């Protein structure tokens, strides 16, 4: 895969939008756009104990109680069992996000360009990429307390991540290239 310039990327996105307007498959078009996603400006980070996941904190807004983060899920892998405590929105930028229940059964597939909004407090689950790494934007909203609860195999709490933790992670991470 060759790297696109910003102009080439915009041209490709514009061409794809035009193709959809003329009747092409939106799913196929979205996949083509996502294939052009250039990660070279993203400085990926990892957390000890959480395998198959990389992150980049985009923003933490204490006043609005919002944490925006890019997450990259490794292809054909599952991350650790966890639970969402904050309301959140997700937009899939690349690949597909696969969700699994606590027993490991596949429950949902979110394809490229899908957008969902969910309330906090859902059932414990794992997530992972499809046949390629999945890159997703998560916007966590409405709490300055726990956002994610990391769980052990028996559902016991191993760790929590909250607004202050994401603020510290953002301050510690490398600045984007540009």
Task: Please tell me what each predicted stretch does.
Residues 1-17:
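N-terminal secretory signal peptides and thylakoid transit peptides that target proteins
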Residues 22, 26-65, 109, 151-178:
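A short, N-terminal "cap"/entry segment at the start of jelly-roll beta-barrel domains
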Residues 62, 103-122:
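Short acidic-glycine-tyrosine-enriched beta hairpin
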Residues 55-57, 68-72, 89, 115-117:
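Conserved hydrophobic/aromatic beta-strand scaffold that supports enzyme active sites
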Residues 75, 84-103:
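Glycine- and acidic-residue-biased ligand/ion/polar-headgroup-sensing regions
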Residues 68-83, 120-122:
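Conserved short histidine dyad/triad with adjacent acidic residue
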Residues 120-146:
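Ligand-binding loop in jelly-roll beta-barrel domains
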Residues 61, 80-83, 87:
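Active-site region of the double-stranded beta-helix
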């Amino acid at each position: 895969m060759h790297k696109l310039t910003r102009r080439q990327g915009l041209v490709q996105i514009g061409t794809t939008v035009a193709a959809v307007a003329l009747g092409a498959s939106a799913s196929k078009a979205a996949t083509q756009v996502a294939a052009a996603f250039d990660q070279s400006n993203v400085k990926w980070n990892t957390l000890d104990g959480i395998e198959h996941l990389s992150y980049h904190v985009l923003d933490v807004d204490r006043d609005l109680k919002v944490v925006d983060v890019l997450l990259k899920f490794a292809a054909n892998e599952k991350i650790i069992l966890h639970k969402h405590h904050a309301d959140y929105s997700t937009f899939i930028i690349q690949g597909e996000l696969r969700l699994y229940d606590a027993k490991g059964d596949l429950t949902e597939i979110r394809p490229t360009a899908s957008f969902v909004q969910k309330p906090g407090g859902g059932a414990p689950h794992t997530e992972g990429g499809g046949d390629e790494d999945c890159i997703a934007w998560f916007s966590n909203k409405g709490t300055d307390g726990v956002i994610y609860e990391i769980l052990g195999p028996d559902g016991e709490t191993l760790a929590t991540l909250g607004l202050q933790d994401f603020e510290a992670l953002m301050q510690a991470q490398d600045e984007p290239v540009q």
